[in-house]
């Protein structure tokens, strides 16, 4: 009886949390660090500022929501430890976070030209609110997930101040 009760509690926990309530780690591909600068400097001297504007692209794919970030400024620790990302879906709120895998910070910022991952499990033709974090926190972005969806966001407009 004790084993059955324990098994039922574990099953209840798994069902109640669901795969959407807990952070879901995803594979991420990226360009890696293409340029770096000292922390506190606003630009990358070797690059045209037009080429370093932060952008976010959301696209429908059969596998899930493709999230592509262009021109992310992350800590140079990614050169050794890489970038991780995770998503949590709670109701219609999708929280997406990309971050340096190793929490050790250096006095250096690295420009990542692009990084992309796919978030599975969204329902087609449904409105979602994306809470996106990558280096900065951004204001919520609303979108409808459906076939043919391809959205571009200038992230400077969405930065929280």
Language model: regions and residue ranges:
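Sec-dependent N-terminal signal peptides
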Residues: 4-14
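Exposed, flexible binding/inhibitory loops of compact, secreted disulfide-stabilized domains
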Residues: 17-161
């Amino acid at each position: 009886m004790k084993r059955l009760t324990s098994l039922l509690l574990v099953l209840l926990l798994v069902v109640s949390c669901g795969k959407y309530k807990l952070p879901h780690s995803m594979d991420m591909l990226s360009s890696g660090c293409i340029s770096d600068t000292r922390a506190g400097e606003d630009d990358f001297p070797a690059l045209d500022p037009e080429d370093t504007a932060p952008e976010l692209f959301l696209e429908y794919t059969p596998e899930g929501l493709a999230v592509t970030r262009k021109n992310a400024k992350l800590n140079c620790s990614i050169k050794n430890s890489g970038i991780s990302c995770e998503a949590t879906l709670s109701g219609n709120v999708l929280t997406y976070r990309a971050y340096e895998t190793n929490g050790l910070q250096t006095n250096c910022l690295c420009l990542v030209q692009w990084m992309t991952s796919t978030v599975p499990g969204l329902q087609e033709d449904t409105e979602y609110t994306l809470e996106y974090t990558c280096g900065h926190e951004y204001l919520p972005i609303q979108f409808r997930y459906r076939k043919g969806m391809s959205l571009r966001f200038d992230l400077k407009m969405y930065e929280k101040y």
